[in-house]
Amino acid sequence: GASLVLVGVAALASCPLQAWLLARLRHHGGLPGFTLPFVLIGLLALLCIAPVSVSSPDVPAPDATTLRDAWLLGIGQVVFLHQPLAAACLLAAVALASLRDALWLLAGSAMGLLAAGLFGAPWADGQAGFNPALAALALVQWRGGWRLPLLGMIAAVAIWRVCIELGLPALTLPFLLATWLGLALRAPHPSRVD
């Protein structure tokens, strides 16, 4: 229906925007665009369609299985996976490539899960964990040890909380802003070190 057409138009509109942003950023040595076109077009589309409700659904009782699944889904949501087993497969694939990266994904998802529990926000679907997981994964690629990914996770959680307070859908905005903050403060990328 109409929503499928809107998704198609938004996807097509994001391609030239992404190409333009990436070209400008590379030309000026600036920050990477990451998910900026998705966030801009997604927010515009969501805010134009209807008022967005970011109210919290019922929060399940935190038993071991539900917590484990939410922890995994915080990683799975990075690529829109909604099943814990699929998320575990993604985590295993990342671990095969880099155990360090997999551990940072787990740490980011755990921080989001913990923050959601503290804030009384929904947590079982993994939505609270994917932004800090993404920020940690992006920032661990630069030198500087554990501080930069930790800063990214904390900033992503704080920005996610601000989005909730403002009634905005977070999408990947917390990841984007937190990662930009971390990159603005970073040591040089390993490939740029002489």
Go through each PLM region and give its residues.
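C-terminal transmembrane helix-loop-helix hairpin of multi-pass membrane proteins
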Residues: G1-L47, A61-A86, R100-D194
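Membrane-helix interface motif
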Residues: A50-D58
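Transmembrane alpha-helical segments in integral membrane proteins
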Residues: A88-R100
